[in-house]
Every structure is written in structure tokens, then in C-alpha cells.
Amino acid sequence: MRLKTEIWVKAYLRRCAANGAFAVVMRHGDDDAGAIFIKVVRGGAHAAVFAPAPAGLDDADFDRRWVAALGGNFVPEREAEAALAREISFDSDLWIVEVEDRAGRHFLGDDLVE
């Protein structure tokens, strides 16, 4: 059974804080089943985006799986914002969590699909 989105996000925010990063909900989506996008800002001007993995890459052993969007690279923050705006136009119930970390860590651990 999958955790409700709101609970997963709260736990993720705590994980980021425990590791010395600042994380905040930039867009609050559906509490029960909204998709979550993670934006990691490094150095204030560049960002990477992590998106929910497609259904075929989902694994029963993990609550949620992630893929690196935008080629898995840090891009100018305005490009990351434009990509997220496109996602919002498709899904108005999605969440966006922004993480500010000097090292650019995403804190998704093994849940990231390479």
C-alpha cells in the first residue's frame, strides 16, 4: 500500500532537514495521490528536477521511484521552472518540493532509477 502523498512529503522534508538541507513545498497538490516533483537547487542559479518514474519502472519493493528529468543535469533554474510549469499544465494536482543544497544532493537514495 502506498503512503499518502502528504505523509511522504512531510517525511521527505524531515529527511532533507536532518541532512542539513533546506526544503520547502513550493506547490501543494492532492493530499492523497498527487504526483511529486523534486527540484534541487545548487548554488542558487542551477537546478535539477526529479520526476515520478513511469509506471513500468515502478517496483513493488519501493513506495515511490524517481527518474532524473532534464537529462539528469543541473540546468539554469529558469529552464527547470519552465519544465515544471509544463507538468502543471498536464496535472493540476501535482506537488513541487524545492530542496536547496550546496552539494546538489537529492536525498532520494535507492529510489532513484538510473
Name each model feature, range by range:
Residues M1-E114:
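Polybasic/polar functional segments that serve as interface/processing modules
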